[in-house]
């Protein structure tokens, strides 16, 4: 059976003032996506009414639909196979290491992973920008509209900026630093969280966010994590609207203010991403644990989705 297995990373989007633009890929947690061409022992393709079948295991997999048109990865695979006239039966198996609804790009990891897998399995040789375009289509299932702020880092790795939506333009910057992520056991719907974001904002808030976002980009010139974190905490638009969705978030920010370079909500939450001072990692972990009693990840930034196994 011809197959390819992909490791696809968790991602953190927005990062304060970079709403729907900035994203980071993390080394941990991650999803594993296996895509196989289904054949009988004799080598003939298995006859089926469904060209694509999906199976799941892992984090909250029972809550994720496996119908192709309702599954983020299924939507991506179907569109790619239609566009490139791929007349094969495939099996998609997703091992969820990223909790759905976490604010860590769970759906994006599946979308990106299957896009990379289809590209590899059928030798399409698509550039990363095209893979992001396809992967972002799956995000419409999870968020109500296609958006690329999570799938871009899930494919490129490191730090990405979605500088234009149509036509899609992405800037990728390789960066190296460690983040500490807390995942409170709180349910937040991506769609509901997006609805909290104001449709119009005061010009002073726009000026603030543009300035702080520019400062963050400048800080990456020499990997200045202290400056990056400082500006990451100064979003005047989105974080204030969403902070109330996460119990004790404001109190935790106050407790760790001298222990981290920066802290903010990851994506639509509930995950919290922080940039701890190296000597303060254990203390910040303790505060997170005592407050939320939740999973905590201390991780470097990661590569984009990549092949871990391939069989002809």
Curated annotation (Swiss-Prot):
Keywords: Amino-acid biosynthesis, ATP-binding, Cytoplasm, Kinase, Nucleotide-binding, Threonine biosynthesis, Transferase. It holds the Pfam family GHMP_kinases_C. It comes from the Archaea. It is an enzyme of class 2 (transferase). The keyword ATP-binding applies. Catalyzes the ATP-dependent phosphorylation of L-homoserine to L-homoserine phosphate. GO terms for cellular component: cytoplasm. Pathway: Amino-acid biosynthesis; L-threonine biosynthesis; L-threonine from L-aspartate: step 4/5. One of its GO terms (biological process) is threonine biosynthetic process. ATP binds at residues 99-109. Belongs to the GHMP kinase family. Homoserine kinase subfamily. This is Homoserine kinase. It catalyses: L-homoserine + ATP = O-phospho-L-homoserine + ADP + H(+). Its EC number is 2.7.1.39. The gene is thrB. The lineage of its organism: Archaea, Methanobacteriati, Methanobacteriota, Methanomada group, Methanococci. It is found in: Cytoplasm. GO terms for molecular function: ATP binding; homoserine kinase activity. PROSITE patterns: GHMP_KINASES_ATP.
């Amino acid at each position: 059976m011809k197959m390819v297995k992909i490791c696809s990373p968790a991602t953190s989007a927005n990062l304060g003032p970079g709403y729907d633009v900035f994203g980071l890929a993390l080394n941990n947690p991650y999803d594993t996506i296996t895509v196989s061409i289904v054949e009988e022992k004799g080598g003939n393709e298995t006859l089926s009414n469904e060209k694509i079948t999906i199976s799941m295991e892992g984090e909250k997999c029972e809550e994720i639909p496996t119908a192709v048109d309702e599954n983020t990865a299924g939507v991506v695979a179907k569109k790619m196979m239609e566009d490139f006239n791929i007349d094969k039966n495939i099996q998609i198996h997703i091992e969820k290491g990223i909790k759905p609804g976490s604010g860590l790009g769970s759906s994006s990891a599946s979308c990106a992973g299957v896009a990379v897998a289809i590209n590899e399995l059928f030798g399409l040789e698509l550039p990363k920008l095209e893979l992001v375009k396809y992967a972002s289509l799956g995000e419409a299932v999870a968020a109500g509209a296609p958006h690329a702020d999570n799938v871009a880092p899930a494919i490129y790795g490191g730090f990405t900026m979605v500088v234009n939506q149509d036509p899609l333009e992405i800037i990728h910057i390789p960066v190296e630093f460690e983040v500490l992520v807390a995942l409170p056991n709180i349910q937040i719907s991506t769609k509901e969280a997006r609805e909290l974001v104001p449709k119009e904002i005061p010009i002073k808030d726009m000026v603030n966010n543009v300035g702080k976002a520019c400062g963050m980009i400048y800080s990456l010139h020499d990997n200045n994590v202290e400056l990056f974190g400082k500006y990451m905490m100064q979003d005047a638009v989105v974080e204030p609207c969403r902070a109330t969705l996460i119990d004790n978030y404001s109190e935790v920010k106050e407790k760790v203010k001298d222990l981290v370079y920066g802290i903010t909500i990851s994506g639509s939450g509930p995950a919290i991403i922080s940039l701890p001072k190296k000597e303060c990692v254990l203390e910040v972990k303790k505060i997170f644990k005592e407050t939320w009693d939740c999973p905590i990840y201390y991780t470097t930034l990661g590569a984009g989705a990549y092949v871990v196994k391939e069989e002809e």
